[in-house]
Structures are given as C-alpha cells and as structure tokens.
Amino acid sequence: MKFKSLITTTLALGVLASTGANFNTNEASAAAKQIDKSSSSLHHGYSKIQIPYTITVNGTSQNILSSLTFNKNQQISYKDIENKVKSVLYFNRGISDIDLRLSKQAKYTVHFKNGTKRVVDLKAGIHTADLINTSDIKAISVNVDTKKQVKDKEAKANVQVPYTITVNGTSQNILSNLTFKKNQQISYKDLENNVKSVLKSNRGITDVDLRLSKQAKFTVNFKNGTKKVIDLKAGIYTANLINTGDIKNININVETKKQAKDKEAKANNQVPYSINLNGTTTNIQSNLAFSNKPWTNYKNLTAKVKSVLKSDRGVSERDLKHAKKAYYTVYFKNGGKRVIHLNSNIYTANLVHAKDIKKIEVTVKTGSKANAERYVPYTIAVNGTSTPNLSDLKFKGDSRVSYSDITKKVKSVLKYDRGIGERELKYAKKATYTVHFKNGTKKVINLNSKISQLNLLFVKDIKKIDVDVKTGSKAKADSYVPYTIAVNGTSTPIASKLKLSNKQLIGYQDLNKKVKSVLKHDRGINDIELKFAKQAKYTVHFKNGKTQVVDLKSDIFTRNLFSVKDIKKIDIDVKQHTKSNKALNKVSNIATKVKFPVTINGFSNVVSNEFAFLHPHKITTNDLNAKLRLALASDQGITKHDIGLSERTVYKVYFKDGSSKFVDLKAAKQDSKVFKATDIKKVDIEIKF
C-alpha cells in the first residue's frame, strides 16, 4: 500500500506539472484573445455616453458643465467610477488622494434613471462586486468636506470672490469662486493669472485662444460701486495694488475671433429645443442646426428630433414605438405652433423656414414597454455581508408570476452577482429569499426546497426581495475517518480515510457500504469474495474509548445511530480461503511453495516472495504472470484493471543459469515455453502510470 501511494503521488505530481503547463498556455492564449478582442474593439470603436457630474467642495458647488465619458451599455464596477471621480477631483479642483484621506468627508452619489441612488464613500476603499450598466446612470454628484486642521484659522481668513464667464454671449451661472487671502494686496497681473486659469479649466480657453480671439477682457466690480476693465490680450498692467476684501465679483467676457468659417456659421440657423421625458425637462441649452438651405419639411425635422432624443436622453426608435406619448411641438415666431407625432409616418407637404421657428419642445412618456417589463429591487446577503439595492430583477410578459419563476431568477442573480451556483446552494447552511409585499406582508422561500408553491402573484405587488445565503464550508460538511485493512494478516498503514457526511447521524448499515466500497477499491475484494471469506469484520474505535465489532457477512444491523464526529478510526480485517479443509489439504499436499525475491521499480519487500505452484517443475510465463498479478493485487492493491490503465507494466525474470527474459504483464497471451519455478533467481517489476 505504501508503494501504491508513492506511485499515486508521483503520478499526481506529473499531472499537476502537465496541468500547470496547460493552464499557463491556456492563460496566455486567453490573454492573447483578450488583447485581440480589445484591439478589435478599439479598431471598430464603441458608442460613447456622457454622464454629467457636479463637484461640491466645502459647500461650494460647480455648475454641470463637464461629463464623464463611458462606453454605452458597458458593465462597470464602482471601483471604475471611483477612479474617474478621483481623476476629475484632482484635475478640476486639485484634490489629491492624500487630501481625500485627510478630509472630513468625501463621497459621491450615483443617481440612476429609475430614481434610485447610491452613495459611495471615497475614503472607505471598500467596493461591492456589483456591476452596473452605464446607460442606467443619470448623473454623479461629488461632495468633499476638507478636514478641519490647524490651518483652518488661515482658511477662515480667506475671501471667496464669485466670478462669471461669458463666451460668445453664452454666460455661466455664478457657482464658482476665486479664492484670495482676506485683505491681501494683489496686482492686476495676479488677478489676470487667476482669470486665465479658470478660463482654461472651466471653458478650455488657452492663452493661444485668447490671443486669437476678437475680444478678451474681465471686469472687476468693487463693493463701492466702481469697476475696472482689464484687457486680457494687452499684456499691459498698472502698478496699482488692490485689496481682495474690496472686490465684489469678477465678470469675464471672451469673443472668439471670426474666421472664414463664420460665413458658413452665419448661414446656419440655430433653433433651441427642450426635451420632456416622463415629466422631467432639460434646460434649453442646445440647438438644432439647419444648413444654409433653411427650408425643410417635417420629415427631416422629425429625423433631427429623433437624433437628439437618442443622443441626449438615450430614447431609441424602439422606445418611441412603445411609448404612451411621443410628440414634439414647433413654436413659430408669429405665435403659431404645430404638434407632430413622432410615431406617425404621415407628414404634410408643407415646408418650414428655420428662421421662422422660435423653439421646439419634445415630449415623451414611456408606456407599454415599461408596463411589459417590470423591475423588482433585490439585495443579496452572503454570510451576513449584504449588497445595497442597486440592481433589479426584470420580469417580462405576464403580470403574474409563480414562486418557481422567482426562484429561477434569484438563483440566476446569485450565480451572476456572487458566483454561488446550484452546488454551493445545496451545501449551504441556509439558502432562502424573502418576498416583501407592498401591503406589509412577506413570504420566505427555501431555495433548496423541491416543494412548489402553486400561488400566483402580481409583480406590481412586490416591494423588494431579500436573498440570504449562509455557506457551510465543504470541509465542515464532511468528516474524514482513518482506516486500516488487514487481509490474511497483511495490514496496510493508515494512509487513507473514509469520507463521511457530518450533516446527519449514520448507522452501521451506512458504514458497511463505505467499508465494502474501500475493500473493493483498495484490495479488489468484492461482495462474493466476502461471502466466501473465512472471516470478514471491521472494528469501529470511538473517541470515548469504546469499540464496536461489525460482521461484514451478516445482514443484521443494530438500529443505533451515532455521529461521525465521534469515530476515531476503523480497522478492517478479512481472512480469505473458505474452501473445505479436505480441499485445502489436497491443495497443500499438491502445491509447492517456491521463494524468489520480487522488486517493484527497485523497491524490495513490497510484495510476497513466496509463490505456490501445483507443478513447479513445468510452468509457463502465463503461470508466472497469474502469480505476480495476484501478489500485486493482494499486497499492493494494484488490480488487473489498474495494470490495464497503466502506461507500462513489465517485468524481467532472471534465471539461475544467468539468462533473463522481459515479459509484458499487459499482454493477453505469452509464449508457451516451459521452465522450472525453482530455476528463477529473481523478478524485477517496472510499473509506470
């Protein structure tokens, strides 16, 4: 048995090495495929989505003028969002990772289009494994409160000067401030540097753009009612110093230089529009552009409206088709208006002039698709660790569902979100989900139960679903009991263990099956051989010192049940040769025992060196094969089946006259040459799995 363990260990190491090599190869191949996929995606491009964000630092907010760029319908983690948030904090407001760690509060809120939101602590460094779709995000708001240090006294001495930026007539609300030390004497040169800095960071206007602009100036409005206009292009400064406490606000005005393209721009007509989606209206900040041929028909106008609906609000043709309401209203400068239905394919032949249009209002109310697809929020708690309500279970079609349908969806999200499959659920200590209804009632369902609930329920009545799983580690679910096997007085060391389940009490009948299984597997002794054995029993040693002997040949079992945890070890004892004494005496009188050493892969004394032959003076290779196979099976548990599965099993027989012969034990037939068993000097067996 020791030798079999040695061979098995060597084989396992070889398989591990081979598997490791395959794994590395597969990993490299997968990595290469990923690179190819990435490069392919990069080559073909992704549809992008812009998500607006705001930054509030110490209560001072910034207007929504910037957006975070993501791939449309991309599954991202909160770690990905956090990286982008930290990047814009550093770029826009100069707040580094160290500043965040030392801050009093640092968080960001993800606002979803379904009205829910999720607050994430930037200082925690803990991220859930949930993935979210970028198309579900409406906006992101970032809030940082710097920690009050000793320097706060100096911070209190600072003064905030509000400013506005107007570029080509488009003004920005006063939502940001320039920071100066209170009552500090500064020059207009210092002021200009600050102005140029906010122009670059807020509106992307560089020094080169300022030099090429038609006009670039800023006006300093003082608290005493006076003001001072400074030309940003002049480069000439007065030597006057001003007190920061005297400044009321600063107005920045830039007009970009008109190039040749301005002629084409003049020819274009800009029509402002607004979009009302499910009652939520966006400000009129964008325009529909019409070419230098201002006459257009309503079909072209509808195409432009559908385009901005998709780009601005993500409303596609399919969404419009299922919408309850989808139309736009064209307001003319003469006071008239025209309502056009977006789902209608009938258009009037009238042409309209872009200059006559005052504005366009788009109204969409999603309808039948929203009703056909219902969403129920859910949480997952695994071993007490819960995820927030960030995801929903999606139900399609019929408004009524069964608990069986819900169970399938719950198992699906468990596998997708937390990697818990059917096997893990089967061995879990607890696996349930609770359906909370809007009327305050709730229903707990066991995920491992095979009893079907026939009740049907309306999805609209479900408030939320809480999933709770407590995994029982596989090691704790099973116990391993050491055992020994003694056949005809030859015992094996305690090298193997019986695997028994901890989940329930067991009886001796259950233990019998396990013992018979290892007897057949380890020593090749089946039920028939046990039946004809002289003795077949096993002894159960308990940890409290007691023992129990069980007869393997008996079909009568005590009804006692006991815990696997109480078993210390099991000793199995089998004595074969159950033929009658007369037959045994006859065999012993005829058979002659011949001794010669046998080694396996160079190891000696691992099998018997005594063999009984009926006719030792005339044996063939087939007779020797049979004896060696029997010795391998009884002494080392290497059965004929194992030999058949081996890569190579041969032996070399050495004779006393100096000759030798190679024999393949896997071969069915050997030569019929006769020789004497007493002429054998030794046998060397080589086995390779």
UniProtKB/Swiss-Prot annotation:
It holds the Pfam family MAP. Both native and recombinant protein bound to labeled vitronectin, fibrinogen, recombinant osteopontin and fibronectin. It was also shown to be able to bind to a 15-amino acid synthetic peptide of vitronectin. Map could affect the severity of arthritis and osteomyelitis in mice through a T-cell-mediated mechanism and could play a role in abscess formation through a T-cell-independent mechanisms. It could potentiate the survival of the bacterium by modulating host immunity. MAP repeats lie at residues 45-154, 155-264, 265-374, 375-474, 475-584, 588-689. The keyword Repeat applies. This is Protein map. InterPro entries: MAP_dom. Keywords: Repeat, Signal. It comes from Staphylococcus aureus (strain MRSA252). Coiled coil: none annotated. Gene3D superfamilies: 3.10.20.120. The lineage of its organism: Bacteria, Bacillati, Bacillota, Bacilli, Bacillales. Each MAP domain contains a 31-residue subdomain that shares striking sequence homology with a segment present in the peptide binding groove of the beta chain of the MHC class II proteins from different mammalian species. The keyword Metal-binding does not apply. Residues 1-30 form the signal peptide.
